[in-house]
């Protein structure tokens, strides 16, 4: 990698980590477009560029989410009961999503990613729902939350995201105050990223990617981004 590429990855790590702490989104949405351009310029197989970018972005979230989760936990904002109820579905969904990605053409994934970002951006522009402090949250039961977790896991693996773009609006729409929704989403980031990354490694193991890659993961990009993302995630959380 050139010095310019390293600097850009470090900056993306700073931005992704800050957003992970601030919004509970994991930073993947910021990283994926840049990584696609980076891997394409580096001469990666065009058929696997998008998959490699998605997998690498998702792997960074494993580390970033731990840093962000710790900061939110210290503030007492994480709703751990919801995390445990969402986690089983998330783990299943991450495996399903990574397997879907392995069979989809890169161009289809790129278009789907752009549409998803546009849709979620429009939802964020509408603003958070105002929640009255005395009104209890209206959440589905155990099976309902497991189903929601599965959907979050699938979408996160498909789009290389930490799930915050889905988890935060869902929890907030059901009556969870925004700070607690963000903190809970940050805690869900680790099972999301772990399951999705594991799935990408299994599906990409025999793809013959270039040196510096482990299955679909580009290790050089991963370990350049991670230190800064972990450093800046607590900054966003506070």
Predicted regions and their residues:
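N-terminal cofactor/phosphate-binding cores enriched in small/glycine residues
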Residues: 60
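Juxtamembrane transmembrane-helix boundary motif
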Residues: 1-23, 30-51, 65-159, 168-180, ...
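Hydrophobic alpha-helical transmembrane segments that constitute the membrane-spanning cores
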Residues: 27, 194-199
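Hydrophobic alpha-helical segments of secondary membrane carriers
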Residues: 57, 184-188
């Amino acid at each position: 990698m050139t010095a310019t590429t390293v600097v850009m990855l470090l900056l993306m790590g700073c931005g992704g980590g800050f957003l992970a702490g601030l919004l509970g989104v994991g930073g993947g949405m910021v990283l994926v477009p840049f990584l696609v351009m980076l891997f394409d310029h580096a001469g990666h197989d065009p058929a696997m560029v998008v998959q490699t970018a998605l997998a690498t972005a998702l792997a960074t979230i494993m580390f970033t989410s731990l840093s962000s989760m710790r900061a939110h936990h210290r503030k007492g904002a994480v709703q751990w009961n919801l995390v445990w109820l969402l986690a089983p579905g998330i783990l299943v969904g991450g495996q399903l999503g990574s397997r879907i990605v392995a069979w989809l053409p890169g161009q289809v994934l790129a278009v789907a990613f752009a549409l998803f970002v546009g849709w979620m951006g429009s939802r964020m522009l509408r603003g958070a729902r105002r929640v009255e402090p005395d009104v209890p949250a209206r959440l589905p039961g155990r099976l309902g939350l497991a189903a929601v977790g599965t959907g979050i896991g699938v979408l996160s693996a498909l789009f290389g995201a930490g799930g915050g773009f889905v988890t935060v609006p869902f929890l907030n729409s059901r009556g969870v105050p925004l700070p607690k929704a963000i903190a809970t989403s940050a805690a869900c980031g680790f099972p999301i990223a772990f399951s999705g990354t594991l799935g990408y490694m299994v599906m990409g193991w025999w793809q013959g990617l270039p040196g510096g890659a482990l299955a679909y993961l580009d290790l050089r990009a991963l370990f350049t981004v991670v230190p800064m993302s972990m450093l800046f995630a607590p900054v966003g959380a506070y």
